[in-house]
Regions:
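Charged, terminal alpha-helix-loop-beta segments
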Residues: 1-242
Length: 242
């Protein structure tokens, strides 16, 4: 079992027994997990849990100012079978997504109309992105842009990565762990779109076209001089939605 030492207190890894408890923690920490430039919409809160082709939530992401995206969110426990449960759920969402587009738009619009603060944030975002109104914005997100998914899970695994890698759906995994000391909790995670947020936090404005190219030496001489000679090896993280 993993442990975390903080301020001379030993925190032990907290095991979530119920998915709803894990999901509540994710929703509470959503601004930190997904970023201040994103809006997490808890669809279950809006319509209940009776419709199986509705994900746990939707994320309207303005990390890329001129290219906002919509992501479906699935909050899962590692105890769930990656093939029969997680993979099949995402496959259902992918298959039904376009056919359910009008209903999804209705859900999102209804949720935004009920929350003034959320609506104002979305409006400011789509105006910056060049959309004339919320209707045109949602039409573009749902019907014109590719579908992306984010699986938030307490413990990732090679099996899960393999399953998600077989889907045509662009999918990211966010591992969200909780450590507990008495009644005190600490959450550990790598933020979604971390590579984008690192640049934003440095005060630079991002454009999608500047993030889709990795430059490497094309000739053997350049490879030997820069990569080997100067030891210029860099680990880069690129989310599936990029």
């Amino acid at each position: 079992m993993e442990k975390l030492l903080y301020n001379n207190k030993l925190y032990v890894c907290h095991e979530y027994l119920l998915e709803k408890d894990f999901e509540s923690a994710v929703i509470e920490q959503a601004p930190h997990i997904f970023g201040e430039n994103s809006i997490y919409i808890d669809i279950k809160k809006q319509i209940g849990e009776s419709i199986i082709t509705i994900p746990d939530g939707y994320l309207i992401d303005f990390s890329l100012e001129v290219e906002p995206r919509l992501h479906i969110i699935e909050n899962e426990l590692s105890s769930h079978d990656p093939y029969k449960h997680i993979g099949s759920q995402l496959l259902k969402f992918a298959i039904s997504y376009k056919a359910s587009g009008r209903k999804i738009k209705e859900f999102l619009l209804d949720a935004l109309m009920k929350d003034e603060s959320m609506r104002e944030r979305v409006e400011a975002g789509f105006l910056r992105a060049g959309y004339r109104n919320i209707d045109a914005f949602l039409e573009s997100l749902i019907f014109e842009k590719p579908l992306n998914a984010v699986v938030v899970i307490d413990q990732s695994s090679p099996e899960l990565e393999n399953v998600l890698g077989q889907l045509t759906l662009n999918t990211d995994i966010v591992e969200f762990k909780t450590f507990k000391y008495r009644n005190d909790y600490i959450h550990q995670f790598t933020p979604f779109n971390a590579e984008v947020r690192d640049v934003i936090e440095k005060g630079r404005i991002l454009k999608p076209e500047t993030l889709n190219t990795v430059v490497v030496p094309a000739r053997e001489e350049g490879f030997e001089k820069e990569f080997l000679g100067n030891n210029r090896w860099y680990a880069i993280r690129i989310s599936a939605s990029m």
